[in-house]
Amino acid sequence: MGNQIAVFIDFENIALWAEQEFLDFELTSLVEYLQARGNVALIRAYGDWSRFSRYREDLMHNTVDLIQIYSVRAGKNRADIRMAIDAFEAAIQRPQLDTFVIVSGDSDFGPLVVKLREYGKYTLGIGPREV
């Protein structure tokens, strides 16, 4: 059956980075790249979707589960915490998932990656070069 891939996108972070660099976030090419390497069984994107409504169509076209994270205040991104919990929960509840892709514009996910690897999962981080 090949690799069973789970993708977790810190959308708020990556979209803001792309906008600062005058880039447009386009998910289809990433999904096609991953599909060539296995079955993309799960894709979740985390953010305040009232702020990123222009991306919804592309995300839904790629069967992404949109996880609403309300922006309460500036500071620590609540999406990071929720995304890490969901990824680890998926690793435990769905042991057939063997590859975890973390798409983010920051480096807050190091502890998650270490723990996923302890559980025998292959991890791939995708983000800006400077992260």
Where on the chain are the PLM-derived regions?
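Non-catalytic, usually N-terminal nucleic-acid engagement modules in DNA/RNA processing proteins
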Residues: 102
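Domain-level signal for Mg2+-assisted phosphodiester chemistry and nucleotide/NA-binding surfaces
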Residues: 1-92, 112-117, 122-123, 129
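Glycine-rich phosphate-binding loop signature in dinucleotide/nucleotide-binding domains
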Residues: 93-98
